[in-house]
Amino acid sequence: MTMELEEIVYKYALWNAVKHNGQAQVGPVVSKVFAERPELKANAKEVVKLAEKMVAKVNAMSLEQQTAELQKYPELLEERKKEEKKTLSPLPNVKGTVVTRFAPNPDGPLHLGNARAAVLSFEYAKMYKGKFILRFDDTDPKVKKPIKEAYDWIRDDLRWLNITWDLEFKASERMSAYYNVAKVMLEKGFAYVDTLSDAEFKAWRDSRNKTVYKPRTNPPEVNLELWEKMLNGDFDEGKAVVRIKTNPEDPDPSKIDWVMLRIIDTKRNPHPIAGDKFRVWPTYNFATAVDDHEFGITHILRAKEHTTNTEKQRWVYDYMGWEMPTVLEFGRLKLEGFMMSKSKIRGMLETGSERDDPRLPTLAGLRRRGIIPDTVREIIIQVGLKVTDATISFDNIASVNRKLLDPVAKRLMFVREGVLFKLEIPQEMKAKVPLIPARQEFREIFVKPGDEIYLDKGDVEEGKVVRLMDLCNVKIEGDRLRFLSQDLESAKRMGANIIQWVKKSESKSVNVIKADPNKDVEEIRGYGEGYFETLKPGDIVQLVRYGFARVDSISRGEITMIFAHE
């Protein structure tokens, strides 16, 4: 193996180590080498052997040293900076101003799955310098009953994602618009009032040899009279509905004469905004068709499970002579290891969990856990408008989050269940510890003979030689840390692990909570270095040799953090 090859393997080991918090891995290093020099695949065994050697060498360095060494290879620094950003594919049928919308039902918090439509709709509006509308789809005060607080939850979640909107409205405040269109459709014979039972309608709908369905044959004047009775409260809930006339022979029974408007007893089921002001409420498909037309929506981005709804809404457009927006459908987005069902999430909320419970895939839960908004946006844009279902594991989320946080997050020392030792050193020493390596920012910690030092319980072993990160090499003897040497080379020769440490006189009590959705919540108590004093709730830092964590609260001198990921 030539010196040139050693240099290639070495630089990629450095690159991989700095990318992964000081710990390079052989596999990615070998892949990079083969990408640069494909002819070396013929000597794969030798390359792997050399990679193992170089990875061991690089991993023995401190992150500060690795970062400094990487400066020798500017081409790799550039590669780190300009990691390719995926952009969205162009929209079809763009004729004028693009207008998109996001129409959540405010019956629960946003999660990663339903945030997809919000991010894509907003990004496309921005891409074409168009308009983005927020429409609250809140016309079902009984089955999918809106939650009053959820309107603000959704606004907060969208703002967190850096999504802004040009216009906002609630469907529940547009009842007169739905009534007006319904009246026109009744007048023109496109719809009818059905006062028969649901069972009678289904018997006709599902029969192979369809006879005449009496309500369907009523003239417009009869339907208009029945419509007025519906509005005036002459019918109880379930006793009358407005149906749209569709194809009676449609192979999908759900599309046959579907309900446009129905009566809901809002004395029993008051709407959180409108109260009991209205009794006749539009269904999702009717209200959506009317609003999308009246607000000039040009492109609708929705999950493919809405295919049937698109076909239903087309009947309204065709009858009214409106131009149908371009509909773009995408597959489901499943977050592996988390519950995505809105009903299950709502169940947890009803039994005491908060919407920002870090075990949940809600945007608030991800935010509290230390996932940043750019991570969510990048993942959604990466998946884009794929029609096939996509599964995103938390590892995928962590990988993107790590990539985005790594250049900006502060590295701080934290020891779990700290064990106290007396530091025996010959004179006062200074540790110059990397704070943000990518920016060449450092902090200084001064220690003197006799200072008390906390070590992580997992690093404590009688007689073990360790290197206190960026300070010196010591041997653990009872409750003492006996000084051996100060240089890093000595630590390498002795095979000493580089470990974090916390000076007792500057220490802060820290409680790290691990909230894995598939495990019991775990609390890790320990101590953080003095720099923790500068932190405030919401700050995300990297705990050296642990991973990323977000400051959740600070109370009576104790800092509580939520662990994000390694």
UniProtKB/Swiss-Prot annotation:
Motif ('HIGH' region): 104-114
Localization in the cell: Cytoplasm
Transmembrane residue ranges: none
GO cellular component, one term: cytosol
Catalytic reaction list: tRNA(Glu) + L-glutamate + ATP = L-glutamyl-tRNA(Glu) + AMP + diphosphate
Coarse class of the protein's main subcellular location: cytoplasm
Keywords noted in UniProt: Aminoacyl-tRNA synthetase, ATP-binding, Cytoplasm, Ligase, Nucleotide-binding, Protein biosynthesis
Enzyme Commission number(s): 6.1.1.17
Matches recorded under InterPro entries: Gln/Glu-tRNA_Ligase, Glu-tRNA-synth_arc/euk, Glu/Gln-tRNA-synth, Glu/Gln-tRNA-synth_Ib_cat-dom, Glu/Gln-tRNA-synth_Ib_codon-bd, Rbsml_bL25/Gln-tRNA_synth_N, Ribosomal_bL25/Gln-tRNA_synth, Rossmann-like_a/b/a_fold
Record's keyword annotation contains Disulfide bond: no
EC category: ligase
GO biological process, one term: glutamyl-tRNA aminoacylation
One GO MF term attached to the UniProt entry: ATP binding
HAMAP family: Glu_tRNA_synth_type2
PANTHER family xref list: GLUTAMATE--TRNA LIGASE (PTHR43097:SF5), GLUTAMINE-TRNA LIGASE (PTHR43097)
Protein function: Catalyzes the attachment of glutamate to tRNA(Glu) in a two-step reaction: glutamate is first activated by ATP to form Glu-AMP and then transferred to the acceptor end of tRNA(Glu).
Family of the protein in this entry: Belongs to the class-I aminoacyl-tRNA synthetase family. Glutamate--tRNA ligase type 2 subfamily.
Entry protein name: Glutamate--tRNA ligase
